[in-house]
C-alpha cells in the first residue's frame, strides 16, 4: 500500500465494508506498506494500522532496509511482518556483509515479535543459508517460479 491509498477515504470505506461482510476476512488479510510510504505520513499510517489491526488485519513492512526507516519507527508502527529487501538477500550465501545485516534484521524482527520474510531468494544456496539462520519465510524465484514458502513458527 502507498501512503496515498491509506489516506484515500473511499478505499478505507470499501475495506471496512468488506470486513463487515465477512467476519473472517481480517484474519486472512495481510497489507504490505513499503518502508518509504510509511515514512511519508507516519501519523496517518500508524493510526490506520492500529485501527485495522483491531479488525484482525496484519501488516508487513515491505522492502525493509531500502529506505529511511529509523529503528524507532519499527517500535512505533507495530508491524506484524518484516520483509527484508532483496538487496540484502541476493548472493547472501557468499556475501558476509549481507549475512551480518540479514542476521541483525532477523534479530530485530524476533525481538519485536515480527514474522521475518526474505525477499528475492533466487538460489537453493541462499535458501539453505537463510533457513540455517531461522528466517520464517522465503519469497522469490527459486527454480524459476515466483513463490513464497512459509516455514511455520
Positions of PLM-derived features:
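Conserved functional hotspot residues or short segments at active or partner-binding sites
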Residues: 48
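EAL-family c-di-GMP phosphodiesterase catalytic domain
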Residues: 1-9, 28-42, 55-153
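Short helix-capping segments at alpha-helix termini
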Residues: 21-26, 52-55
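A short, hydrophobic coiled-coil helix within the histidine kinase transmitter core
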Residues: 14-18
Amino acid at each position: 500500500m502507498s501512503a496515498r491509498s491509506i489516506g484515500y477515504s473511499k478505499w478505507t470505506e470499501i475495506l471496512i465494508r468488506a470486513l463487515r461482510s465477512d467476519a473472517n476476512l481480517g484474519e486472512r488479510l495481510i497489507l504490505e506498506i513499503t518502508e518509504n510510504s510509511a515514512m511519508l505520513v507516519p501519523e496517518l499510517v500508524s493510526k490506520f494500522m492500529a485501527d485495522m489491526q483491531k479488525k484482525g488485519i496484519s501488516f508487513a513492512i515491505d522492502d525493509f532496509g531500502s529506505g529511511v526507516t529509523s529503528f524507532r519507527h519499527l517500535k512505533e508502527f507495530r508491524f506484524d511482518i518484516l520483509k527484508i529487501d532483496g538487496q540484502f538477500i541476493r548472493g547472501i550465501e557468499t556475501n558476509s556483509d549481507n549475512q551480518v545485516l540479514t542476521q541483525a534484521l532477523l534479530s530485530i524482527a524476533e525481538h519485536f515479535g515480527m514474522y521475518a520474510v526474505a525477499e528475492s531468494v533466487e538460489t537453493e544456496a541462499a535458501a539453505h543459508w537463510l533457513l540455517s539462520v531461522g528466517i520464517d519465510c522465503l519469497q522469490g524465484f527459486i527454480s524459476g517460479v515466483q513463490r513464497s514458502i512459509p516455514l511455520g513458527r
